[in-house]
Amino acid sequence: MISGILASPGIAFGKALLLKEDEIVIDRKKISADQVDQEVERFLSGRAKASAQLETIKTKAGETFGEEKEAIFEGHIMLLEDEELEQEIIALIKDKHMTADAAAHEVIEGQASALEELDDEYLKERAADVRDIGKRLLRNILGLKIIDLSAIQDEVILVAADLTPSETAQLNLKKVLGFITDAGGRTSHTSIMARSLELPAIVGTGSVTSQVKNDDYLILDAVNNQVYVNPTNEVIDKMRAVQEQVASEKAELAKLKDLPAITLDGHQVEVCANIGTVRDVEGAERNGAEGVGLYRTEFLFMDRDALPTEEEQFAAYKAVAEACGSQAVIVRTMDIGGDKELPYMNFPKEENPFLGWRAIRIAMDRREILRDQLRAILRASAFGKLRIMFPMIISVEEVRALRKEIEIYKQELRDEGKAFDESIEIGVMVETPAAATIARHLAKEVDFFSIGTNDLTQYTLAVDRGNDMISHLYQPMSPSVLNLIKQVIDASHAEGKWTGMCGELAGDERATLLLLGMGLDEFSMSAISIPRIKKIIRNTNFEDAKVLAEQALAQPTTDELMTLVNKFIEEKTIC
């Protein structure tokens, strides 16, 4: 069996189609002076062909995925046609007498390597996008064949060293049942696209292309993160049964789509979705989300060469507001920094970026960024039920300063005659121990809290969740973390406010009953987790959950706490 990184869930059965292109061989010989013009023309001609191909892919991506994914390929075209890139390549041809392919390879590889050296995991994975563009350019310069994935005629499971975003956008979805790659990560554009399409995918296997041949029969189990190669009939029958069970469970859960998240004894909470773009709203609605508990606006700031303008942001926020209709959308202001840097911003080199210049600290230092974003959100609030949420808050002073800024921008919009929601709600992320311990004071300043358990856990336990050596210490169900969460919920309720949660813990089935019993008002998670969490809530009594929470929070260790929770779940047969 083969395993890797589970990129998109599902189970598929089919023959393997191994994607292998002609090897790109770079001609590194020195050219003569009278060959320079010819090589420059080879580069420009190859670039023109590559740009035309990307225009076609961009159009198809827009039709299949929506405007946000179309914008990815608009970015690819912009990079390919970038004047500085052109000048660098032509300079190498003219000054160093390099061939067109050698010059293009050196410049593109230099850009990709620079991205890989960054600490930011997201930007590291953008190196694959740059190499995707470079590979297409080189194949056109060299006159090599480019595989047309949209022309696949048989039902297959794709096996490749890697699938680039442009290749993924070309997939014939009636024929491609899923894909497996040697490389890739869960946050790559390819993985994100697979989830958008609900196409089973496992990436980062390391060696699937060396273990699979064309026409091998595969079972892609992207539920348990396993790939079976030429399995026995017994294994096939067993996995068919698993597939039927998964499909049956999915169908049963789908029946809950339009039902409220209400317990057997009548206590109701909200189950919402975390989104990154307007395209995600469709999946949220399909899975029964009752709103958007976290709209991550930082994706608007990524995959581009400059900060988005107020108008660009307004268009994006308006699209989400209109797509969600009467449902509330919590718009988190830009959460950049930490593990998410922007190549066009001058980030300082920091010993610990998670404790440094990030999120609201950047916005308060760079008021023009804050102004553009808040004005855009306010203007979009005229088209739906938007709420504003600030990340990385540690003090009441910050909240008061931010509210003053909002009032300034509101007055600007009034003076300009631009509509907005005068009573728009303002909330904060509680993701630092500082915010949690002064929650009783913060609750007087805002309309709601949303607990970010990923960072709250990391900061409370002093554990870098990206450090494999101590990752076992990262325990969101630690009594210390859970008692802080309870303190925050109680503080908000004492002021007549509500508390939601948008961290990974909100979608953790083992934590649902505990959080419910602690009084959490809103659970926000990946859309795909919503049906199962809603089922758990609808199958329990709120009073039982409160008893569980009281007992669990009194436990001294995580193991004892989890033993209690697991016993309760088994006895109630809830999950």
From Swiss-Prot:
Residue(s) carrying Phosphotyrosine: Y122
Post-translational modification, as annotated: Phosphorylated on Tyr-122. Phosphorylation on Tyr-122 is important for polar localization but not for interaction with TmaR and for activity.
Subcellular location: Cytoplasm
Active site residues according to the UniProt entry: H189 (tele-phosphohistidine intermediate), C502 (proton donor)
InterPro entries, per database record: PEP-util_enz_mobile_dom (IPR008279), PEP-utilizing_PTS_enzyme (IPR050499), PEP_util_AS (IPR018274), PEP_util_C (IPR000121), PEP_util_CS (IPR023151), Phosphohistidine_dom_sf (IPR036637), PTS_EI (IPR024692), PTS_EI-like (IPR006318)
Major site of localization recorded for this protein: cytoplasm
Binding site for Mg(2+): E431, D455
Reaction equation(s) it catalyzes: L-histidyl-[protein] + phosphoenolpyruvate = N(pros)-phospho-L-histidyl-[protein] + pyruvate
Enzyme class (EC, first level): transferase
EC number, UniProt record: 2.7.3.9
Signal peptide residue numbers: none
Domain of life, source organism: Bacteria
Keyword Magnesium carried by entry: yes
GO MF annotation list: identical protein binding; kinase activity; metal ion binding; phosphoenolpyruvate-protein phosphotransferase activity
Entry keywords, A to Z: Cytoplasm, Kinase, Magnesium, Metal-binding, Phosphoprotein, Phosphotransferase system, Sugar transport, Transferase, Transport
Family the entry assigns: Belongs to the PEP-utilizing enzyme family.
Comment field on protein domains: The N-terminal domain contains the HPr binding site, the central domain the pyrophosphate/phosphate carrier histidine, and the C-terminal domain the pyruvate binding site.
Subunit comment: Homodimer. Interacts with the pole-localizer protein TmaR. Binding to TmaR is reversible as long as TmaR can get phosphorylated, whereas binding to non-phosphorylated TmaR is very strong and shifts the equilibrium toward binding.
Cited function: General (non sugar-specific) component of the phosphoenolpyruvate-dependent sugar phosphotransferase system (sugar PTS). This major carbohydrate active-transport system catalyzes the phosphorylation of incoming sugar substrates concomitantly with their translocation across the cell membrane. Enzyme I transfers the phosphoryl group from phosphoenolpyruvate (PEP) to the phosphoryl carrier protein (HPr). Can also use (Z)-3-fluoro-PEP (ZFPEP), (Z)-3-methyl-PEP (ZMePEP), (Z)-3-chloro-PEP (ZClPEP) and (E)-3-chloro-PEP (EClPEP) as alternative phosphoryl donors.
Protein name: Phosphoenolpyruvate-protein phosphotransferase
Gene symbol of the encoding locus: ptsI
